[in-house]
A protein has these predicted regions:
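C-terminal glycine/acidic-rich active-site capping loop/insertion
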Residues: 1-6, 244, 249, 278-360
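Receiver (REC) domain switch-region micro-motif
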Residues: 45, 89, 170
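A structured beta-alpha segment of the ubiquitous adenosine-cofactor-binding alpha/beta core
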Residues: 67-86
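N-terminal Rossmann-like dinucleotide-binding module
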Residues: 1-63
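Glycine-rich, aromatic-lined ligand/substrate-binding cores of catalytic
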Residues: 205-290
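Beta-strand-loop-alpha-helix segment that lines the small-molecule cofactor/substrate pocket
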Residues: 88, 94-147, 162
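Predominantly a Rossmann-like dinucleotide-binding segment in NAD(P)-dependent oxidoreductases
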Residues: 138, 146-237, 291, 383
Length: 389
């Protein structure tokens, strides 16, 4: 692992958070991931709309009380006025706030790391994309976190290097099973089960954002049309909790996705399969250290992380450990933070960098997921008719 850019820059990035209090699982994941490589220092935050949770989280994070805010607008204003103000902010709020918070901090000259989904609607996403494009000096990353796994990046490189021949089929599923019943107290439900946060099709903002981004990341293909069927299988639920998609790609390439919150017995479920003319790739998030490369006419290969001589540069760059030591979710998430930080350093130092290695999901990737989301919603409303993207 190289620390040359960090050493050249001479200090950690001053980092802040909006959302992600102690009552948030993903907030702690962001903090763990950012700390892994010594590139970020948490110096400020509007960590919760609940003042008690915000204060408690700030205390646990050892923040100066003067830099613990209960309003992200006040945080953006005051931090932008400080010589030692935050340089990067992570947005870990529900999606209906992502666009507003992102644009505010970007307008103050602060780079943004945004949780998925990018926004609540496609209209907001396109507007945010335009807003970012008008500020070319700003960095913007969407945390499509599973793209940080070493073997996911290895799969991407293998596809691009022609190991599968011509890609013919792309399949990506996320059938999780922990949400078989609905909370009777509506106010205690997660945003994914409250349509006011992201519509009745919020399953696409949660697990769908991962499958859509993963399919494009690995295959390099962007769908041109989608057919979708969605269902509510849980009594009392207001949002769809199961969805099936068919996708068409340029050149006759086919795709399929299954999203679910009610796949009973599944702890997680994220997996992809890419089939080409010469072979195929299979990967599962619950077994992240195994990538199966299947060939036509000869035995399959089981690829594992930790072998610099057996992996592409892209796959090896994402490895943290030598062979035999499991790589995990937080390490994969941390790869996004590391790549973002090194991109930040390189830009500040006027240095070039290899974008194949420093791969961060951009606002354009976030917009892509929202385009598929909106097309799928329209298709479902039209009884599964094909909708062009």
């Amino acid at each position: 692992m190289s620390y040359q850019l960090l050493r050249a820059f001479g200090r950690r990035i001053r980092w802040g958070m909006v959302g992600g209090g102690l009552d948030s699982l993903i907030g702690e994941v962001h903090r763990l991931s950012a700390r892994l490589d010594n590139r970020f220092e948490l110096v400020a935050g509007a960590l919760s709309i609940d003042p008690a949770i915000a204060a408690e989280t700030a205390a646990v994070c050892l923040l100066d009380t003067s830099r613990s805010y209960t309003d992200f607008r006040e945080m953006a204003e005051r931090e932008s006025e400080r010589e030692d103000g935050v340089e990067v902010v992570t947005i870990a709020t529900p999606p209906h706030l992502h666009a507003e918070v992102s644009k505010l901090f970007l307008s103050k000259g602060i780079d943004v790391i945004c949780e998925k989904p990018l926004t609540r609607t496609l209209e907001e996403a396109v507007e945010l994309e335009r807003f970012v494009a008008e500020r070319p000096k700003r960095l913007f990353m969407v945390t499509h976190c599973y793209t940080g796994y070493p073997l996911v990046r290895e799969a991407r490189a293998l596809v691009r290097n022609g190991a599968l021949g011509e890609v013919r089929q792309v399949e990506c599923d996320f059938p999780s099973g922990p949400f078989m019943t609905e909370n009777s107290d509506r106010n205690r439900r997660h945003w994914r089960f409250r349509p006011e946060f992201m519509g009745k099709e919020a399953i696409f903002g949660e697990v769908g954002a991962h499958t859509i981004s993963m399919a494009q990341f690995v295959s390099g293909k962007t769908p041109i049309a989608v057919s979708a069927s969605m269902s509510i299988l849980t009594e009392g639920r207001e949002t769809f909790d199961d969805a099936h998609l068919l996708l068409r790609y340029p050149g006759g390439v086919l795709g399929r996705m299954w999203l679910s919150f009610v796949a009973a017995g599944n702890d997680h479920g994220l997996a992809f399969r890419v089939y080409g003319t010469k072979g195929s790739l299979i990967w599962r998030q619950t077994e992240p250290d195994t990538l199966l490369l299947q060939h036509v006419g000869r035995p399959a290969e089981r690829l594992i992380p930790g072998h610099p001589d057996r992996l592409t540069p892209e796959g090896w760059h994402a490895c943290r450990l030598r062979e035999g030591h499991p790589e995990g979710y937080v390490l994969a998430f941390g790869n996004l933070y590391r790549d973002f930080a090194d991109t930040f350093f390189a830009r500040k130092l006027g240095q070039t960098f290899d974008e194949r290695l420093f791969r961060i999901p951009t606002v354009q990737d976030g917009v892509h997921t929202m385009r598929v989301y909106e097309a799928a919603a329209q298709s479902n409303q039209r009884s599964g008719s094909w909708v062009n993207l």
